[in-house]
Amino acid sequence: MNKVKFKYFENPREIFSLIENRDWSVLLDSNQNKFSRQRFDMMTSDPTIKIYGRGEKSVVEDDKSKKHIQLDPISLLHEYMKDSFNQDDSLPFTGGAVGFLSYDQGNLYECIDQKKDDFDIPYIAFGIYDWALIINHDVKETILIYKKNTELVQKIKNQLESFEEDNTAYHFEINSNYKSNLSYEEYVEKFNKIKSYILEGDCYQINFSQRFSLNYGGSCWGIYKTLSESYGAPYSAYLNYPFAKIMCFSPERFINQNGKEVETKPIKGTRPVSLDEKENSQMINELKGSDKEQAENLMIVDLLRNDFGKNCDFGSVEVVDLFKIETFANVHHLVST
C-alpha cells in the first residue's frame, strides 16, 4: 500500500466536496470539536467491487461485469475480502470494505416476519475500496493511501496540492410537508397493542418507530454539510449511492472490534446542553438521578450482554462503565460500556 502525506485539513467536508458526486463515495466524519474524542476522518469512492442485495439474493459488480448470485451478501463479502490489504497500525483503514447493513437484513437472520416492503433499496451494500484519504487530527496531517496509482488517484493528488476552499452555497429546498407512513389511528392502535404486550409480560421494551418522508429539491450533500456542522455528532457519515443518499448524525458507536475484544457503548437517557452554567449543572444532576433513564439504559445493557454472550467466550462479557454521563455538542447522554 502506497502512502503520501499532504497538509492538514481540519474540516473533512472541505475536501470531500472533491469526490462527493463520484460513484459510491463515502465520508466517515468524526466532527472534530471539544466534545469529539475521535482521531480520524476517512473518505473514499469508486470501489473496485460492489456487493449489494437482500436476503439470499446478491449482486456483485466490478468494472467488467455484473453478476446476480443466490447467496447472502455477507457471505459474499467474506469471500471477496480474502485478498488481504496491507495493515498499518497507525491508520484506521488501508483498503477494504465500507458500507451499510439494515435492520431488515438482521430480521431475516432472526427469522422475524417482514412487513410488505415499500422501500426499494438493498438491505446490504458494501464497496471494496483500494484507496482512501485519511485525516489524522492527533498529528495534524492528511494521508492518501492507495494500491495503484490510477487516473483517479493522480487527480486527487493534483487537487490536494492546489486545493482552495470552495465556498459554494449548495441549494436545498423542502417542497412538501412531512408525512408519516402511519396514520394517527394506526399509530394509536399499535401503541395500545404494545402496552398490552408489556402488561401481559410478553416483552419489556419495544423500539416503536415510524418513517417520515417529504419531497425535496437540490443537493443532499449540501444539507449534510449544514446538519453535520450544526449537530457535531462524532459518528457522522455520508454515503452516496445511485439508489439512495444515506446520512448519519449519531453520537453512538454500535460496535468496535479490536483483535478479539469487542466493545459496545449503548446510550439511553438524554438532557439538553444549556449555555447557562447553573441550568446545565441541573440538567446533568437530573439525568444522573433519573430512575426512568437508568432503567431504560440497564434494559439495553442486559440486551447487549445477552447478544454478546451468544458469540463471546463464556464469562468474558463484563460491564466496565455503567450510567456514565457524556456531553456532546447539544445534549448530555447516559452511556454504558
Segments the model singles out, each with a brief description of its role:
Residues 1-337:
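Extended alpha-helical targeting/anchoring segments
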